[in-house]
């Protein structure tokens, strides 16, 4: 989780999880939830790559998404290569 920016982002997400998210019905179609995914991605890959992965995940989470198990990838996909799958197989 290295730097201060990563820690600050994770604290903000934890505040959201604790105080804001409970005010709404569960809407995330994936496991882990989008906020849990964001925390793990930022902790694993740092603020920039982790935020990039979290944004991609949030954009995939919509009413027409099939959903299901969608873990943080074990290797970070190249943001310049959008043809790479969202989560490469392990």
Curated annotation (Swiss-Prot):
Keyword Cell membrane: yes
Domain of life: Bacteria
InterPro entries attached to this UniProt entry: Membr_insert_effic_factor_YidD
Pfam families, per database record: YidD
Location within or outside the cell: Cell inner membrane
Keyword terms: Cell inner membrane, Cell membrane, Membrane
Topology versus the membrane: Peripheral membrane protein
Gene Ontology CC: plasma membrane
Family that this chain belongs to: Belongs to the UPF0161 family.
Cited function: Could be involved in insertion of integral membrane proteins into the membrane.
Protein name listed in UniProt: Putative membrane protein insertion efficiency factor
Lineage: Bacteria, Bacillati, Cyanobacteriota, Cyanophyceae, Acaryochloridales
């Amino acid at each position: 989780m290295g730097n201060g920016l990563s820690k600050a982002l994770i604290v903000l997400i934890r505040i959201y999880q604790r105080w804001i998210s409970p005010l709404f019905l569960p809407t995330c179609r994936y496991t882990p939830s989008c906020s849990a995914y964001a925390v793990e991605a930022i902790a694993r890959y740092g603020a920039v790559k982790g935020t990039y992965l979290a944004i991609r995940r949030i954009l995939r989470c919509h009413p027409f998404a099939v959903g299901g198990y969608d873990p943080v990838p074990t290797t970070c996909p190249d943001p310049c290569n959008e043809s790479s799958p969202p989560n490469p197989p392990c």
